[in-house]
Amino acid sequence: MARIAGVNIPTNKRVVIALQYIHGIGPKKAEEITEKVGIPAERRVNQLTDAEVLQIREAIDRDYVVEGDLRREVAMNIKRLMDLGCYRGLRHRRNLPVRGQRTHTNARTRKGKAKPIAGKKK
């Protein structure tokens, strides 16, 4: 099992698919990485040499923000919005939808479980 960017990637899958197990790498970036390194798309992880794994690891470290660094960057961006006090920051602070969705009904995922109101009946 190869370890890239702190993630154990599955050995029996194709390299393009296995790279997507890393947070921050999707289908497009996985294809870009394999093209840069020069690995065929149908090659599987267990067929890679140590040198190829090292090349992939270096390409990811050099060109992409992944895993913990990416999570930290996103969290800092949200914190910055909240500190500014802008509309998006206020919505994050109140755990409400940020991108203009309606909240009168719906928005249960963001707001959490419905809170019962005492004495209210139909």
Swiss-Prot record:
Belongs to the universal ribosomal protein uS13 family. Residues 95-122 are annotated as: Disordered. This is Small ribosomal subunit protein uS13. Keywords: Ribonucleoprotein, Ribosomal protein, RNA-binding, rRNA-binding, tRNA-binding. Located at the top of the head of the 30S subunit, it contacts several helices of the 16S rRNA. In the 70S ribosome it contacts the 23S rRNA (bridge B1a) and protein L5 of the 50S subunit (bridge B1b), connecting the 2 subunits; these bridges are implicated in subunit movement. Contacts the tRNAs in the A and P-sites. It comes from Methylobacterium sp. (strain 4-46). InterPro entries: Rbsml_uS13_C, Ribosomal_uS13, Ribosomal_uS13-like_H2TH, Ribosomal_uS13_bac-type, Ribosomal_uS13_CS. One of its GO terms (cellular component) is small ribosomal subunit. Gene3D superfamilies: 1.10.8.50, 30s ribosomal protein s13, domain 2. GO terms for biological process: translation. Part of the 30S ribosomal subunit. Forms a loose heterodimer with protein S19. Forms two bridges to the 50S subunit in the 70S ribosome. Coiled coil: none annotated. GO terms for molecular function: rRNA binding; structural constituent of ribosome; tRNA binding.
